[in-house]
């Protein structure tokens, strides 16, 4: 299987997000890379489903709460930026203060 660097990055994010989702479902608080991967994967999947940039900017703030992550993690992630592929091309989605 031949994958581009971007495809490899997306698979790595998906794998980390899957692990984060499993831990979150078991009540384990997420660390920094898990939280970023979880939010990033949610945005990538939303773009694939056809949501707009504005919808995803709002959606990104609903994925995790302070209760889902370790202490100090919300302050470490002031924003998440994701290059997502939409039906009309690639766009940058920025989610400010993703963990509330």
UniProtKB/Swiss-Prot annotation:
CDD domains documented for this protein: Urease_gamma
Biological pathway: Nitrogen metabolism; urea degradation; CO(2) and NH(3) from urea (urease route): step 1/1
InterPro entries xrefs: Urease_gamma, Urease_gamma/gamma-beta_su, Urease_gamma_sf, Urease_subunit
Keywords, in A-Z order: Cytoplasm, Hydrolase
One Pfam family linked to the record: Urease_gamma
Keyword Transmembrane helix found: no
Catalytic EC class: hydrolase
This protein's GO CC annotations: cytoplasm
EC number: 3.5.1.5
Quaternary structure annotation from Swiss-Prot or TrEMBL: Heterotrimer of UreA (gamma), UreB (beta) and UreC (alpha) subunits. Three heterotrimers associate to form the active enzyme.
UniProt similarity note: Belongs to the urease gamma subunit family.
Record protein name field: Urease subunit gamma
Species of the source: Acaryochloris marina (strain MBIC 11017)
